[in-house]
A protein has these predicted regions:
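Alpha-helical transmembrane segments and immediately membrane-proximal extracytoplasmic
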Residues: 4-370
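Acidic, Ser/Thr-rich low-complexity segments on the non-lumenal side of membrane proteins
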Residues: 38-45, 379-405
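Intrinsic-disorder/low-complexity, polar/charged segments enriched in Ser/Thr/Lys/Arg/Asp/Glu/Gln
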Residues: 232, 377-381, 435
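Short flexible coil/turn linkers enriched for glycine and charged/polar residues
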Residues: 316, 374-376, 389, 401, ...
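Long, charged amphipathic helices and adjacent flexible linkers at domain junctions
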Residues: 357-382, 457-468
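Structured cytosolic regulatory/catalytic domains appended to multi-pass membrane proteins
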Residues: 367-372, 385-388, 422, 429
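Cytosolic Rossmann-like ligand/nucleotide-binding regulatory domains
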Residues: 391-461
Length: 471
């Protein structure tokens, strides 16, 4: 009931946390800083100690994003220009949260670019990199204080993987297609479960009770299904299970993840996805051993499957590849084989027309949030002021409000003539005195205008406008 009540008050904390945080990073939705910070921590602790098959990395990303926003809000009181950095601050906090959760700094940086914003920008890179490095330093200092060791650790420490020999490379082709099908199945199960629960209007309290009771009962007989799955992954890689046991664990884990992640409780899907990928990899590894593959390559198959499965579900292959390298300690071993399987899995899921899971979950959140509201297409003519956040930066380096496109630029050329220009794929530098024609699709025109003002107006002008509107 505690979880249900908190979800009612703070619906932002439902589920993984990553899809919602991505929406905030992209400017599509907002955080309520204190509410989300406290609610996420409390609910994720309950989920963790109850043994739900969910991970802690989703809440870590959400808490990191909230901290980033909170820090930016503090600076806003001192310097109005800080508001223009809001989404960058959230991005930095979120990427740092993921990096610390996995002790995977490079993954945190790539996540911000490939998954969070789905584009490369120097400002996003520098913000996420500086946040990740500083957070990693703090994490290691805390580790030094508690364990006496300053160095990092590997979540699934493994010796270098054996490279698949040339005569067995055909197995990787089959594995890639099979993992792609498995990723599509997982995504479909998640979406269908959510649709069915919503269709039959199952109350949140009932969903939570069913989730906690099922985990409690099944966990008595199958302790390996409890928690996110990091311990399970180590056992699978060590060849501790028969194929029959792997199949049983896979079916139960798939079922429980679908029920728990759609119950409304707080918990991530990153580690559970890796666990499901490992289970599929273990099953296919047993199949390939029956077909003549040597046992020494089994672990390689499991690790590759984890990476490819996550890449197929989330549709972030580079993040998946680097994450597995960082959490296992096998930085280059098996890189070639992993690349082959990830590409095949990715193409398989694309051919099946399955949408990336986090994007699907975010779309559902946005639909519920804006249900009944009218979306308008509006055009703004804005003047770039000297001393503004945007002046001197490239168009692509600005995190424009969600739904905005630069339609036309009106400026004075070297001959003193007024000319119209296009944005040159975001490469054009923004100069004070330019006039930008911005077209936007929005639910809230006033809020959008305020966001644009923070980017293109001098802070003093923004302050004066706020004072006038306050009066």
């Amino acid at each position: 009931m505690c979880i249900r009540d908190r979800i009612k008050i703070i619906p932002e904390i439902k589920g993984s946390g990553i899809p919602y945080t991505e929406g905030v990073m992209r400017g599509q939705i907002k955080y309520r800083t204190i509410h989300v910070f406290v609610g996420t921590i409390l609910n994720s602790f309950i989920s963790f100690f109850a043994g739900l098959p969910l991970g802690g990395e989703g809440p870590s990303v959400q808490v990191g994003g909230v901290i980033g926003q909170g820090v930016d809000q503090v600076f806003e009181k001192v310097d109005p220009r800080a508001k223009a950095f809001n989404r960058l601050a959230i991005t930095g906090g979120a990427s740092a949260g993921l990096a610390v959760a996995f002790n995977a700094p490079l993954t945190g940086i790539i996540f911000a670019l490939e998954e969070g914003h789905k584009r490369f920008s120097p400002s996003i890179f520098l913000t996420s990199a500086s946040s990740v490095l500083f957070a990693t330093l703090i994490s290691r200092l805390l580790r030094l204080a508690t364990t006496g060791t300053f160095s990092g650790y590997f979540m699934f420490k493994m010796v270098d993987l054996e490279s698949i020999p040339l005569n067995n490379l055909w197995m990787l082709l089959i594995l890639g297609i099979l993992i792609g099908l498995a990723a599509a199945l997982f995504s479909k199960i998640q979406v269908v479960t959510k649709v069915l629960l919503d269709k039959f209007k199952i109350p949140t309290l009932a969903r939570l009770i069913v989730a906690f009771v099922l985990v409690g009962i099944i966990g008595v007989f199958l302790t390996d299904i409890l928690g996110g799955g990091s311990g399970l992954i180590k056992k699978i890689a060590a060849l501790d299970f028969t194929w029959q046991m792997l199949l049983l664990l896979l079916v139960v884990k798939l079922f429980l993840i679908a029920i728990c992640s759609n119950s409304g409780t707080t918990g991530g899907l990153f580690v559970p996805m890796l666990a499901i990928g490992a289970l599929f990899g273990g099953l296919f590894g047993h199949l390939f051993m029956a077909m003549g593959m040597e046992e020494v390559y089994y672990r390689t198959m499991v690790i590759i499957s984890m990476s490819a499965f996550m890449g197929g579900v989330v549709r972030a292959p580079l993040t998946a590849m680097v994450l597995i390298a960082e959490v296992t300690g096998s930085l280059m071993s098996g890189f070639f084989e992993t690349g082959i399987v990830i590409c095949l899995a990715y193409f398989t899921v694309e051919l099946l027309d399955i949408q990336p899971l986090y994007d699907t979950l975010l779309e559902g959140t946005l639909y519920q949030l804006h249900k009944g509201q009218e979306r308008k297409i509006v055009t703004f003519e804005i003047n770039i002021e000297d001393g503004s956040f945007a002046a001197g930066r490239a168009i692509r380096d600005i995190l424009w409000p969600s739904g905005c496109i630069v339609q036309k630029i009106v400026k004075m050329n070297k001959e003193g003539q007024i000319v119209s220009r296009m944005d040159k794929d975001g490469e054009r530098l923004i100069h004070a005195g330019d006039v930008y024609i911005i077209q936007a699709e929005t639910y809230n025109e006033e809020e959008l205008r305020e966001q644009l003002d923070c980017l293109v107006l001098n802070p003093k002008t923004v302050k004066i406008k706020k004072q006038k509107s306050g009066n």
